[in-house]
Amino acid sequence: MLCFKSSSRKPLSFLQAGNLVNGDSFRHSRRNLVFFVLLAGIEGSLYISQDDVHYTLGPGEFMLLMPGHVHEGYRSSEGRLSYFWCHFRAGDDYQLVDESGVKQYLESLERSGLPKDIYLLPEHGVFANTNRISL
């Protein structure tokens, strides 16, 4: 799994956000965007692929879609579907780091005592507390 890494000294640029709500049979269109997309599942399952790797986004889960990578629905949803989406840009200094790279970076921060002024966001995962995402 990859992890988005960027300096927090350079803020991310918010573009737009919304809440998709669909009653039945939603299938995400095929796109290749120039910005990041953060998805947060609220209800139902979104069946989406990125570069032909299939994912299922369920309630309480998040996923980061990468710029310059094709994403699309690989199957229609069944029943009610709701998820939040947020489009944002990062500065040119962002990196996509694998798990071992993240571990090494965090260990070096602990040893050096330097300030931890970075954003780290895995490409997918589960929210620890879903109370805030179901506003």
Please annotate each region the language model reported.
Residues 15-33:
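Conserved short histidine dyad/triad with adjacent acidic residue
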Residues 32-48:
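Short, conserved beta-strand element in jelly-roll/cupin
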Residues 39, 64-65, 85-89:
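Short beta-strand segments
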Residues 30-31, 56, 128-133:
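Aromatic-acidic/polar surface patches that form glycan- and anion
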Residues 34, 67, 82:
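Residues that flank catalytic or metal-binding motifs in active/ligand-binding sites
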Residues 2-19, 70-135:
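A hydrophobic/aromatic-rich effector-binding and dimerization subdomain
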Residues 52-67:
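Short acidic-glycine-tyrosine-enriched beta hairpin
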Residues 24, 45-47, 63, 67-73:
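Histidine-centered metal-chelating micro-motifs
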